[in-house]
Amino acid sequence: MNYLFKNGRYMNEEGKIVATDLLVQDGKIAKVAENITADNAEVIDVNGKLIAPGLVDVHVHLREPGGEHKETIETGTLAAAKGGFTTICAMPNTRPVPDCREHMEDLQNRIKEKAHVNVLPYGAITVRQAGSEMTDFETLKELGAFAFTDDGVGVQDASMMLAAMKRAAKLNMAVVAHCEENTLINKGCVHEGKFSEKHGLNGIPSVCESVHIARDILLAEAADCHYHVCHVSTKGSVRVIRDAKRAGIKVTAEVTPHHLVLCEDDIPSADPNFKMNPPLRGKEDHAALIEGLLDGTIDMIATDHAPHTAEEKAQGIERAPFGITGFETAFPLLYTNLVKKGIITLEQLIQFLTEKPADTFGLEAGRLKEGRAADITIIDLEQEEEIDPTTFLSKGKNTPFAGWKCQGWPVMTIVGGKIAWQKESALV
């Protein structure tokens, strides 16, 4: 099916929002211009809505295989499509881990059979993510590994991390890191700060993250490896990454929507839906994340979509697993709380969720360019809705944002020229 989207707006090559039509033919973007006419194409009048590149998320947890009670490739990718994401990168903390030919081939077959959006799987750095034996990077790359990470845990052995970076560098691949120094975790379930003290909870200190990043940056410099930092959350981490970039070290970084919108002061009670890793930090950390995003220290926004069951989250804040769902709330949360409040521009938000992650990892995505795959998201910037977890397509309903009123909701997502998801009656 060919589509002609009429009367939309998009961000052009100069970063300006302008009027446009967009023609999709044979799964590709055929033309982006005003007043397009075309035969043999279904005309969809988007009536002034934003035509954006499909959103790109380099940090997601789909749980399959092994955690299908939390999420599946099918439910997770449908939730991603509803959130406007057309390309997502799946973390390897599944059971089994994609750490060898057999497991990666099985995962790729599942993706091919079930995914509603483009899914790029990470390969594990170490076998079973146990930290003691390196995987066969060459084989995992051959089978389509996006990059290498043990996300969910930090690689504790510096010699292992250095060896992994050297091998990844030879393959022109990135090493992606969840940064925690295990000796500093303190059995914590929240940030070590005012909230932990008030509620008598063990806290995770900020330095637990930043000291690990500092170590890895020096290792990346020694290995001449592209090193990407997951979900930055502390002022110290931002400072270390900024210094590394100024020194010319190949480091990039991401931040989550929840760390940009919330800090520990916003946690109303010992509610497990506010439990994520890294935890919500203090006000100074939150301000540093915004500053880091604006000055280029932090390159992109990634959701860290981490679904869990209601039963798992009902165990109380100390026993419940870390993580919140992110796909279906990301854009409206960021648009409402950052763009509408004048903290960043709409153009910047689009870049942080599209071209910046795509360019960082060399993906042919994130831009509406003629000849590229038609991965497109239509967004109604005027539409206001209340976040209602019961409407989530993800199996995970675990969100701290239930009841929040937000503007800027995706209404249609196109992947490879096919409609992957559409809001009922939004475009008629």
Curated annotation (Swiss-Prot):
Which residues does Zn(2+) 1 bind? 59, 61, 151, 304
Named in its record, the pathway it takes part in is: Pyrimidine metabolism; UMP biosynthesis via de novo pathway; (S)-dihydroorotate from bicarbonate: step 3/3
> Know the name of this protein?
Dihydroorotase
CDD domains, per the entry: DHOase_IIa (cd01317)
What NCBIfam families is this protein classified in?
Answer: PRK09357.1-2 (NF006837), pyrC_multi (TIGR00857)
Cofactor note text:
Binds 2 Zn(2+) ions per subunit.
HAMAP family cross-referenced by the UniProt entry: PyrC_classI_B
Q: Name one GO biological process term.
A: purine nucleobase catabolic process
Q: Which organism encodes this protein?
A: Bacillus cereus (strain ATCC 10987 / NRS 248)
Q: Which InterPro entries match?
A: Amidohydro-rel, DHOase, DHOase/Allantoinase_Hydrolase, Dihydroorotase_CS, Metal-dep_hydrolase_composite, Metal_Hydrolase
- Output a single Gene Ontology CC term carried by this record: cytoplasm
Record carries keyword Zinc: yes
Q: Give the family this protein belongs to, as stated in its UniProt record.
A: Belongs to the metallo-dependent hydrolases superfamily. DHOase family. Class I DHOase subfamily.
Reactions catalysed, semicolon-separated, are: (S)-dihydroorotate + H2O = N-carbamoyl-L-aspartate + H(+)
Q: Name one GO molecular function term.
A: zinc ion binding
